[in-house]
């Protein structure tokens, strides 16, 4: 664990160098938050739509912003570059797992992004949540467990798709596919509450809704704390399936690896 902690710390500190980029990213995130809040306020006002209030949507946007910033990764491009220039050979010689090295490196960079981008958004969002009822303790605990699983699930998704870079010469589009599928079937832009029944049914058999949508459901009490085991169990099942799948893909990729460059 100490090795991965060092990787995490170095990745976190490396982001402190780019001050202008940090400021522009924070401003962009705040602007995006403001636009979404204005849109939902125009659509919902102070009333209810399909049982959804404006404060529900504020919380929804804050949680989605947190998850998106914490799980942002372009693993496919990282692996593609390493295979192309031959540096993947050195990566495989490290006395640590390449998967968990990527995990520590990504979370180190993204943790800095959460601090500089999400905390200001949460502070602004708190003004809109002033009159909201506090969630029950059981819902909060279920939310935290589900959120941790959702973050890990999103990493597994990006990592599994990223391993395709060993087989595909140009894979810039893979991250776009992951993002598009998560946005549509994960309900990160428009909540699944507003989807047609058919699409909601499809989303239940895919992993994307368990990344951020189900944690928000638990926090808002739409999924009672007593039924929290259902989405949590589904997230665990998907983590197991993707974990087994990426292990098979990794072994196949390493066995058939041809290093270019050097």
Language model regions located:
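Hydrophobic transmembrane alpha-helices and immediately adjacent juxtamembrane helices
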Residues: 1-262
